[in-house]
A protein has these predicted regions:
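ABC transporter nucleotide-binding domains
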Residues: 2-4, 11-205, 211
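Hydrophobic aliphatic residues
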Residues: 13, 174, 222, 292-293
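Residues at or immediately preceding the N-termini of alpha-helices
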Residues: 68, 105, 215, 258-261
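Residues that scaffold the ATP/ADP-binding catalytic core of kinase and kinase-like folds
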Residues: 70, 218, 288, 292
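Short, charged/small-residue-rich alpha-helical element at the C-terminal edge
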Residues: 224-298
Length: 298
């Protein structure tokens, strides 16, 4: 059964469209990356899924049915704006929020201690939230999100404030949840995290769906737009090259829509350049994001 099925969502504010005909689904055991520029309509889409607000038209089904009180307890939501009680010790905050998801105290306490230990936070469980670093608070928020073993996770910038060690720890835990069959929506501006974690991607720009599908297939579609070259010496201007990006492997050349890799190779040869490597590359999701956010939706 599909965990989330969104059909033809529309939402406007004061006559200005924020979400325009967005359709997608998320199944068990997969992570969908929800990406787009600021103000693209991602937050509105998430709020509609969570029933925080109603769409002007369109439908959302969770586990094959409309949102209900029973369905809400199958969802774990990690918002970008944190909702922890700052004057409470971490463990008290976790247990209180777990109770709102229907967990009894004994079960919640056992589960909380397990998660605190997994995240390296067990020794800090009696520390008040207000005395914790941003990264520690983020880990507590993550624990609150998953403590009731939800079937659907919706996470907005989950890695914000985390150091590299805790980022890797959380990524591993999220990957394990996916392997356990959880459906996960990951909304973030960190394209490298999307590439590492997500199976599929939905990009919204100006309220519209501009990219949707398997991440590998999406990257393959953009393969012709970039080549990686390594040469001896320096080369001059190349017609049809819109950007040069120096990296540890040489130079990545971003090509205009109507420019073929062969024409660039011919130009380099015409300049008498010794070419050690010329490879049609699959551009990073970051590059694709910039390309699509710039208004080209082909």
């Amino acid at each position: 059964m599909t965990a989330v099925a969104v059909q033809h969502l529309y939402k406007s504010y004061n006559g200005e469209p924020a979400v325009k005909d967005v359709t997608f689904s998320v199944g068990p055991g997969e992570i969908l990356g929800l990406i787009g520029p600021n103000g693209a309509g991602k937050s509105s889409t998430v709020k509609i899924i969570l029933d925080f607000m109603k769409p002007d038209s369109g439908e959302v089904e969770l586990f094959g049915q409309p949102m209900s009180e029973a369905t809400k307890n199958q969802i774990g939501y990690l918002p970008e704006a944190k909702g922890l009680y700052k004057d409470l010790p971490a463990i008290d905050c976790i247990l209180y929020l777990a109770s709102l998801k229907g967990m009894d105290k004994a079960t919640a306490k056992k589960r909380a201690d397990e998660l605190l230990e997994q995240t390296g936070m067990l020794d800090s469980k009696k520390k008040k939230i207000k005395h914790m670093s941003k990264g520690m608070g983020q880990m507590i928020q993550f624990i609150v999100t998953i403590i009731h073993d939800p079937e659907l996770l919706i996470m907005d910038e989950p890695f914000a404030g985390l150091d590299p060690v805790n980022t890797e720890l959380m990524k591993n835990m999220v990957g394990k949840l996916r392997d356990e069959g959880k459906a996960i929506i990951l909304s973030t501006h960190q394209m490298n995290q999307v590439e590492e974690l997500c199976d599929r991607v939905l990009m919204i720009n100006k309220g519209e769906e501009v990219l949707y599908g398997d991440l590998k297939q999406i990257k393959s579609r953009f393969k012709k737009h970039s080549v990686q070259v390594s040469v001896d010496g320096e080369f001059g201007d190349l017609t049809g090259v819109t950007e040069k990006r120096v990296n540890k492997e040489g130079v990545e050349l971003v090509l205009a829509e109507d420019t073929s890799p062969q024409s660039v190779l011919d130009q380099l040869r015409d300049q008498g350049i010794i070419i050690n490597r010329f490879e049609i590359t699959t551009p990073s999701l970051h590059t694709i994001f910039l390309h699509m956010a710039g208004g080209n939706h082909e």
